[in-house]
Amino acid sequence: MWALLVTQSAHTWGFWMLLTKIPSYIGSVFDTDIQNNGLWSALPYLTAWICSFPISYISDVLIKRNVLTVQASRKICNTIGEWIPAIALVGLGYVTKEQPGIARALLIFAVASNVAIYCGHNVNHMDLSPNFAGPLMGITNTVANICSILAPLIASVIVKHPDNVGEWRNMFFLTSIIYFLGNLTFIVFGTSKIQEWNDPIKEKKDISMSSATESSVEKGYAQREKDTEKMDLGKES
């Protein structure tokens, strides 16, 4: 659960940083008018929506055909969804004002590949706890959304001059590091195994059965001692 929380927080940071700051980056660094800015800011998300269909289908097919385990599929998709955007953002940090085409291509690449997380950690809640996937999503999403507040605020602190490529580079590098560490945590500690707390009723039954078994054993020993005492008394008499 903790690995899921960390990677979801990392994704939320990157998602909201890009969503809220792409228009400012494109408009200020490349001096794009508001009409073209709107088009170029929306294009990465349109591409992401289109890419979500084949990614979901391929992930599902690979699991059904036993090419990948559920856990392997989750981690591979999550890696695509967080490490590829991290690499794209590092590249974006070195794009100059004279290279708007490269910047737009990298932004599209970063945002489009990010949708793979919907076959990664975003469905991991159902893997961990089919019975409590909703509450689990509520808990992790609540904590992760703190990052959705912090990301734009910290971006505003780092990028004080929106037309300064160097300041944007620092912000992109920070986001790349967060993406990298978030997914690394999920790769190392993440799991798709159903957790014990998923079925509290069964757990109570197991405890009750264990207690009942222990009581039966104790009664058996007590009865055996009584029988032994009776036999000893019989011999003495």
Residue ranges of model-derived segments:
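Extracytoplasmic gate region of multi-pass secondary transporters
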Residues: 1-56, 114-126, 148-152
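Transmembrane alpha-helical cores of Major Facilitator Superfamily
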Residues: 9, 42-46, 83, 108, ...
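Interfacial helix-cap and linker-helix signal at transmembrane-aqueous boundaries
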Residues: 26-30, 58-59, 63, 154-164
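Paired intracellular helix-loop junctions of major facilitator superfamily
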Residues: 31, 64-65, 97, 124-134, ...
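A membrane-interface helix-boundary motif in multi-pass transporters
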Residues: 33-35, 39, 70-76, 157-178
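A late C-terminal transmembrane helix in Major Facilitator Superfamily
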Residues: 52-53, 130-162
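C-terminal transmembrane helical hairpin of 12-TM major facilitator-type secondary transporters
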Residues: 71-120
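Intracellular terminal tails of multi-pass secondary transporters
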Residues: 163-237
